[in-house]
Amino acid sequence: VDDAHGVGTMGPRLGGTGQEQGVQDDIDVYFGTFAKSFALIGGFIAADPEIIGFLKYNTRSQIFAKSLPMPLVLGAQKRLEMMRDRPEFKEKLWTIVHALQSGLKNAGLDLGNTNSPVTPVYLKGGPAEASNLVVDLRENYGIFCSVVMYPVVPKGVIILRLIPTAVHTMEDVNYTVKAFSEIQSKLSQGLYDRENYAVGLGS
């Protein structure tokens, strides 16, 4: 199970989607990332010792690979402790997630069928629109989000991925919803077709 979006956000002890569904003990190989709920880099695989041993000696990416720097390992351990000992973080996170996702939906934005804090916003456009749009968001609204384009998604589709956290506020949510309403309006008007639109807007 690749549970990049579930670990640290779902389950009674934030153990992920399997824990949330009550099937964690039935998972043979469990993948997770430190790049989302842990706010770090790297990832992990959890499995029986025999499987881990096989992967260590047979996975090409492991050949000549180095361990994560110790500060990052210690940081991951500390975050894991906080996830287990501070249940209020989960409650705050999901309050923000539900507010953001419902706000975006009420504003007419398409979020698909997300069930995790990672919030995709589906828009229509090509590379030019996507480039101008994300620069506009970053430079003029102060909002950073990753963008997914073809060939990961069909041509003409743009996905912007927002990752709300437990330290965001309702003011952040309201600001983000307003910003996305505005960029959706600009996109529908064809304003992002203009070359260097987003950069020029802030000058």
Show the residue positions of the predicted features.
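Active-site PLP attachment segment
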Residues: 19-54
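Catalytic PLP-binding core of fold-type I/II PLP enzymes
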Residues: 1-13
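Short, ordered loop/turn segments at secondary-structure junctions
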Residues: 4-6, 49, 69, 150-152
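Conserved PLP-binding catalytic core of the aspartate aminotransferase-like
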Residues: 86-101, 105-141, 150-157, 164-166, ...
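A common structural junction motif
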Residues: 139-144, 180-188
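A short glycine-threonine-serine/GTX helix/turn-capping micro-motif
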Residues: 41-42, 59-68
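Short beta-strand
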Residues: 31, 65-66, 110-115
